[in-house]
Amino acid sequence: MEESIKLLVGCYEQVLFGYRVHREGEQWLSSADFTHHAHTASVSVLAVNNRFVATGSRDETIQIYDMKKKVEHGALLHHNGTITCLEFYGNTHLLSGAEDGLICVWNTKKWECQQTFKAHKGQVLSLSIHPSGKLALSVGTDKTLRTWNLVEGRSAFIKNIKKNAHIVHWSPSGEKYVVVIHDTVDVYQLETAAVVGTINNPKRISSAQFITDALIAVAGDEEVIRLYDTASQKCVCEFKAHENRVKNLHVIELQGTHVVVSSSSDGYIKMWRIDMEKVQTSPSLLCEVSTSARLTCLSAWLPSGVDHKEKSNTAVTASAVKDCDRPKKKKAQNETTDKEASETQVVHKKRKPETKQKKKKPS
């Protein structure tokens, strides 16, 4: 069976690019699949599941595309401000965050906004859904890390941090998560909700993606990608990936092979094969694509759904969610209980957003 994926990138020029990458023998070949003038302002963020691609923009809209039918599915209008983060949970839900401080939970069957959280006093900068779909994390410009109980649709916990974090990610198993502040990556353990180690990168971090629970890829404001051991926090490999600074990373798994996809200010997208038995050696370049555009965001779509299959519900039980919510007997200065957090939460159940249904094929 021929291996084939779609590399998707957004850019300052308001365009969504799609490139087909497929394997022929030992070679990976790329070809332009589509270009689409997606927004009226620069594309800021991308998210995919095995059916749809969602794009967010500075024009304050979320555009939905059906990758199987190759048609524009519609627009979601709810936020007031640049869309800063998008993430699908399987085929059922999409979470969006924006400069207006809101996190919206969308049902992907009817594309209704089921819930709206007043998530942060400032902008929402990053969000991440636990593999179980029961918890989510978010960071914003109010110097807080917030935990959301998606089972009951409410705030679970608020942790004050010293500086604004701009990236948060769960590990593949959901047992760890990372919070990125400027040039540092704090590694947290879910069980204790405490920092178990800190990775120090030489440059400000633009992207960080788990390859496995034990290995994370980090890109900063430079041409280099580094792989760090999350247990020892040591750099196990670094290599020059691009001619200009690396903007985005995305990790996929193809038939047991871990692949890091990178995009850069030089307009190139590259695919790197990680040899998990020889992590210290530089990854091999599988293919590269020149877009001649100023790239802003990156993702990959797998027609087979290998990378976007429904996530396991075994990682976090209902009791674990309750344990996360339970206030501590003694509250530290930098922590806030759910009771205090609930005062800032706004929930609008089953509110229908304005939608624009289109059947316009991309050129």
UniProtKB/Swiss-Prot annotation:
Q: What Pfam families does the database record attribute to this sequence? A: WD40
Cellular location(s) = Nucleus, Nucleolus
Q: Which InterPro entries match?
A: PAK1-Kinase_Regulator, WD40/YVTN_repeat-like_dom_sf, WD40_repeat_CS, WD40_repeat_dom_sf, WD40_rpt
Report if keyword Repeat is assigned.
yes
Segments of skewed composition (Basic and acidic residues): 322-342
Q: Where is the composition biased (Basic residues)?
A: 347-363
Can you supply one Gene Ontology CC term for this chain's record? nucleolus
* Disordered as annotated region, ranges: 309-363
Which keywords accompany this UniProt record?
Nucleus, Repeat, Ribosome biogenesis, Signal transduction inhibitor, WD repeat
Write out the GO biological process terms: maturation of LSU-rRNA from tricistronic rRNA transcript (SSU-rRNA, 5.8S rRNA, LSU-rRNA); negative regulation of signal transduction; ribosomal large subunit biogenesis
Q: Which GO terms describe its molecular function?
A: protein kinase inhibitor activity
Q: Principal place where this protein is found?
A: nucleus
Q: Where are the WD repeats?
A: 38-75, 78-116, 119-158, 200-238, 241-282
Functional note: Negatively regulates the PAK1 kinase. PAK1 is a member of the PAK kinase family, which has been shown to play a positive role in the regulation of signaling pathways involving MAPK8 and RELA. PAK1 exists as an inactive homodimer, which is activated by binding of small GTPases such as CDC42 to an N-terminal regulatory domain. PAK1IP1 also binds to the N-terminus of PAK1, and inhibits the specific activation of PAK1 by CDC42. May be involved in ribosomal large subunit assembly.
Instruction: Give the protein name, as stated in the record.
Output: p21-activated protein kinase-interacting protein 1-like
